[in-house]
Amino acid sequence: MTHNHDPYSDAKELAGLTLGKATDYQAEYDASLLQGVPRSLNRNAINLTAESLPFHGADIWTAYELSWLNAKGKPMVAIADIQLSHESQNLIESKSFKLYLNSFNQTKFDNIDAVQKTLVQDLSECAQGQVTVKIIEPKSFGIQRVVELPGTCIDDLDIEVSDYDFNPDYLENSTDDKQIVAETLNSNLLKSNCLITSQPDWGSVMIRYQGPKIDREKLLRYLISFRQHNEFHEQCVERIFVDLKHYCHCTKLTVYARYTRRGGLDINPYRSDFEHPGESHRLARQ
């Protein structure tokens, strides 16, 4: 596994992003504000090709600050649950997504269906892939749940840590081939940094797998090693998936991370080779 070369250092695909630059906020609808980043930028570095991905899944976004004007000019608010297929050509850059959603604020739409259809059309075009959008109206806010990730939390392991550089080699020799298990583990200690701005990205991650039992201390050290790693949320989750398959020989694997929101958006990448995402419920920190 290659983990020394930085695939992003001179990537022209990142040069035009509004992320990390001063920007004006537009209050009237403008689909051109959306910016995509090719998934291949990260996948090439971890030896993945679009034709032979070892997982399926989605980037599950929650938009908490969706607002527009109805036909009479009265402001409306809602939450949007957005799922972007793992097969899309691009991921969507989050600051551009925020700016795009802000452009709805002073724009009239005839009804909520028109808002939903506009979101699907524009996001699908930017991502070059399938997108679904569910709009949650205020009358349903009361049934929105706060949950914990399934499984056993590994964060209480009493370990000493002095190295915070990303290192997948923590997973080397981390399994016991004599113990074949099916278990679900989670951690709230995932932290990485924005690829462009280096701002901290705080997350929780669930790992559900079948295969040789993974040493939990080594797994926790591996997850902590993301602490100073600069990469987008979606890319971190795919990297975790690939590393676990490579080092731990999981026969079945799901990696699901939920990151805290920024700019009214949270991103929750889900990758699995045997199951599909269920209902999206936020965690306490989201």
Swiss-Prot record:
Record-listed NADPH binding positions: S94, K95, R262, G263
Subunit (UniProt): Homodimer.
Residues binding substrate: I92, E93, S94, H233, E234
GO MF annotations, alphabetized: preQ1 synthase activity
Catalytic activity: 7-aminomethyl-7-carbaguanine + 2 NADP(+) = 7-cyano-7-deazaguanine + 2 NADPH + 3 H(+)
Name by which UniProt lists this protein: NADPH-dependent 7-cyano-7-deazaguanine reductase
Compartments (UniProt record): Cytoplasm
Annotated organism of origin: Shewanella sp. (strain MR-4)
Keywords: Cytoplasm, NADP, Oxidoreductase, Queuosine biosynthesis
Origin superkingdom: Bacteria
